[in-house]
Every structure is written in structure tokens, then in C-alpha cells.
């Protein structure tokens, strides 16, 4: 049922999130490489072969044209209902790991099979130092030959045009 469906992902600040659509915000005018990106809802890990959902929270999905391509769009559409059902499933207790941080901890995660989020901490009491690295690699066969539409063709900065965003 899910294989073959495409989620429409969009940055939260461009006015296409569920909340922005419900509040009547006008989506930002974007350069072609900044537009929402369609991604398969089900991806197969290129090493383990394990299938997993590739979804984001409602702030990072496009509710103007989606969030699921080919299904009724908008916050009350069939695509939104399916996304909420998938998020409820993916965040069930048996699928959730909560790290209890200790000084010196290092967490390494494979984002190809991971839905993650930040959690609250007491910034007045604790110092938080986070470093993120991204390892480039093969995201899976679903992307073989994919044109990287989020990279400007003219070599300009990826964030060009976002001065007023």
C-alpha cells in the first residue's frame, strides 16, 4: 500500500506546513532548487535491505500540494490523515529510543532509518554542546540516477534568495 507513494517534504519556514496552511499564510516564492522535494515514503537501506518509513513531522511536510503526492492535499485531506497515522505508528513506544545523556556521550545514528527530534532540557542549568556531521553516501536504489534538484544549477549559494525568509 505505501510503496510507490511519495511524501512531499518542505522546510518549515516556507509557509507550506500544516500550521501555516491552517493559519492562511501565503507560501514564500522560492527559487527552483528551494522548492519542496518528493521522497519515497518507504525506503530500503542500501546495506541491510531493511525497509523503513521516510516521513517528517507535520512542520516539515508540504500541506499545500501534499503531504502525500497523489492523495487529497491539505490539513484535512487523505494525505494528511495517512501521514498522521504513519507518525502515530512510527512513534509507538516499541520504536522509540530516548537517550539519557551523560557527560562525554557520543551518539551515532544512521539517518537512513531514523526519525529523530530534539527534546527539552534546562538551558539555565546545563550547557549543551552539539556537533553534527553528515557522511555522504548512497541513500538507496530508489535514488539511482536522481537529479539533485535542490542544488542550484548555476553554482549559486543554496540559500540565495532567502534574505527575507
What are these regions (language model features)?
Residues 1-106, 112-165:
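Non-heme Fe(II) oxygenase catalytic core, chiefly the N-lobe of the double-stranded beta-helix
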Amino acid at each position: 500500500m505505501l510503496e510507490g507513494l511519495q511524501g512531499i517534504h518542505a522546510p518549515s519556514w516556507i509557509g507550506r506546513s500544516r500550521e501555516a496552511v491552517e493559519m492562511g499564510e501565503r507560501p514564500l516564492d522560492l527559487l527552483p532548487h528551494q522548492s519542496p522535494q518528493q521522497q519515497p515514503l518507504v525506503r530500503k537501506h542500501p546495506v541491510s535491505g531493511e525497509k523503513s518509513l521516510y516521513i517528517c513531522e507535520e512542520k516539515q511536510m508540504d500541506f499545500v500540494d501534499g503531504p502525500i503526492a497523489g492523495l487529497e492535499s491539505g490539513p484535512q485531506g487523505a494525505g494528511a490523515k495517512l501521514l498522521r497515522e504513519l507518525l502515530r505508528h512510527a512513534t509507538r513506544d516499541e520504536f522509540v529510543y530516548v537517550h539519557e545523556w551523560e557527560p562525554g556521550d557520543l551518539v551515532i545514528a544512521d539517518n537512513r532509518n531514523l526519525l529523530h527530534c530534539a527534546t527539552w532540557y534546562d538551558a539555565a542549568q546545563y550547557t549543551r554542546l552539539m556537533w553534527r556531521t553528515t557522511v555522504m553516501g548512497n541513500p538507496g536504489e530508489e535514488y539511482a540516477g536522481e537529479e539533485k534538484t535542490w542544488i542550484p544549477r548555476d553554482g549559486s549559494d543554496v540559500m540565495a534568495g532567502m534574505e527575507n525568509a
